[in-house]
Amino acid sequence: MTAKYLVSPRGGRRAYRDITSALRAAEVRGRAALIEIAPGHYEEALTVRGEVRLVAAEGPGTVLVSRPRGAVLDAFGTVSVHGLTLAGRGAGMDIVGCHTGSLTLDRTEVRAHDGVAVHARPHTSVTLRDSVVLYGRTVFTGSAGLAERCRFTDAADNAIAALEGARVTVRGSRIEGSRIHGLRVCDAYAEITGCEVTGTGQAAVVADTRGELAVVECAISATHAEGIMFIEQSRGSVDRTRVTDALHGVVTKSGAGPVVRGSVFADCRDTGINVQDAGLGTFEHCRVLGARNVAVFSTKGGAPELRDCHVSGGNVGIAVTDGGRGRFTRVVVEDLTGTALRVYDEGGAAFSHVRVERCPAGLEARGNGGTTAEVTDSVFRDIDMGAVAIDGQSRVTLRNVTAERGGMVGFTVAGEAMLQITDSDITGVSSGGIGALGSGRLVARNVTVTGSEGLGVYGTGTAYVDVTDSTFTDCALAGASFDEKAAGRLADCAVDGTGALAVRHNGLVDLTALRTSLPVVRHKEKPAGPPPQVVQILSDPVFNGPVFNGPVHDVQLAWNNDHVVQQQTEGDGTHP
């Protein structure tokens, strides 16, 4: 049976003037206690032992318990607090601490002007319901925790921290204005569901040091840094969550590998999905909208895998750089102001069933021989400049790739790079279908170019072009053109339609089994120039001087001298 105690600052019959006196009486009796507290301000520190309920008799906000310095409530046992306001300050102090057993804060407000607001110590359990925590952080250390329908405002540190094996659940709550993180999980487990997190100074939600974090149906906005971050071999999941106006939507690095599903990263100020420093991650059915710099970024050993994702608006779609890797399957990239797919500087990417539409450039690859990209079963449509352009020493393979209304060019290679194309189609380009420039190497098998306003295939510089079993139809200027010292072969190919020429070549390309009714022409050889002028200098013991093979004018000569000083005096302009 529960014993009931009344507390009133005015005293009265069977009423205690302070809460501490009622707690002492309850401890002496050793029974479960209900302590009802009349409205007022109680300046005292409460140490609660046993099974005790502290209740504001006239509802939340009517009872204030505070101290100018130090802890306000220390709980040992099974303690619940209903409707009280607990306020205190003190660096390094726990304003409310659960030392043993369990503590429940229901419709309670905790103000921690300095230090920790609520601390659940190891092997304890703390529950907050419909409560408010102001200024201080709520810490779960090796304990169990639950926060439902709470508000955590303006924490000077992390709003909520789960540490050292803690298991914490946060539901339906709002976290706002934290100077560091909204929720930090360090070597612990936390689940945050249906929450709003906004205005944090650093990552809104973060897992580190092998922590495990589950984020479900949350709204994260206006963070100064990352929306969600997994680092230091942490793991977990993000489901049906929206991140808006973060520097980076979600970041994973240093061995972390979350699974992110059905989430949206909108209007991020730098990147939407950022995987770096050996980070991992699987992203399914996600959308990145309006990323200011790069929508999906893999760098420095990062290795994400994206499936069924959508990138729309913003600058660059997917960028894999500086040794990053990535696999991208059934991804749509559209309506960008920059490049859709970028692979630079030893990056390695595999794109499968990717669709790129309405972008200035499709795929760009540039870097040394360790820079590679593979594109299969993909479509580039309405690209302003070129569907695929590679440079440096990079290596790119295209299989069953289509470029429709591809802008200026379809697929081109330059520098010392190598481009291999198989079973692919290009339609509606303005300059050329496939081509090699500089010292680039182009190998194409079963490629079709239709309706080019310029050329079907071309080579310039010292490029090498090897094209077999391909068809070039209705290419306005020529089906194939080879200039300068470009070399290679055109074997078992067909040039047909209404173009002006089948092939215009320089004599360095092997034309084998070419099927065409259009003319094949060779560039005219440039006429030989005049022989170089030679000036002979004869030197022997008898004579040492120049020999002239014709008239010479306006020269200055000196020989047999160890030192020569040349002076020139300007005349009056009357002599040549």
Label each residue range with its predicted role:
Residues 64, 106, 129-130, 239, ...:
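Extended, small-residue-rich solenoid/repeat segments and analogous flexible loops
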Residues 42-46, 66-70, 89-94, 114-119, ...:
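Short glycine/acidic-rich loop motifs that flank beta-strands on beta-rich extracellular proteins
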Residues 500-576:
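Long, low-complexity intrinsically disordered regions enriched in small/polar
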Residues 42-55, 63-103, 114-123:
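Extracellular beta-strand-rich solenoid/capping regions of secreted or surface-exposed proteins
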Residues 1-24, 28:
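Right-handed parallel beta-helix/beta-solenoid
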Residues 23-33, 59, 75-79:
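Beta-strand repeat architectures
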Residues 33-37, 54-56, 492:
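Extracellular beta-strand repeat scaffolds in secreted/surface proteins
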Residues 58, 80-88, 102-112, 125-136, ...:
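Right-handed parallel beta-helix
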